[in-house]
Amino acid sequence: MIAIASDHGGYHLKEHIKAYLAAKGITCQDFGTDSTESCDYPVFGKAAAEAVASGQCEKGIVICTTGIGISITANKVKGIRCALCADSLSAEMTRRHNNANMLAMGAGIVGPNLAERIVDTFLNTEFEGGRHQRRVDLISAMEE
């Protein structure tokens, strides 16, 4: 299960990604928002991040206009490594080297087709472990 959330600026892209993943047989749990009415991204980003951190969802996708605010929010939740990506290479490398468990995107930065490629790359790339695990452990130790 994939946690997904957005604010008003990311609502349309969130709905597009939900439909795209559903067509591929991937289930999403939507943590809001449910319209383009102005709202506060920390509310929705936090809810999705908590679902990933608790194990309720395997990974998460969060979207706002730039992706910046909602990624900062998600990264405040212990156990979350949320990467803001605007290209497939970043999505690949953050999974391979950082074991990112959440993806943030900016709806004003990436269009639907690019977002699909970024999401596919993020969800289908495995963590390499090895020397990268040591680095992820050092990051995680900072949360204590």
PLM feature spans:
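A short beta-strand-loop structural module common to alpha/beta enzyme folds
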Residues: 27-38
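A general structural signal for well-ordered alpha-helical segments in protein cores
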Residues: 14, 41, 45, 71, ...
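Patatin-like phospholipase
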Residues: 12-16, 23-26, 43, 47, ...
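C-terminal binding/interaction regions
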Residues: 5, 9-10, 88-144
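Helix-adjacent hinge/juxtasegments
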Residues: 44-84
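N-terminal beta1-alpha1 ligand-phosphate binding loop
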Residues: 1-17
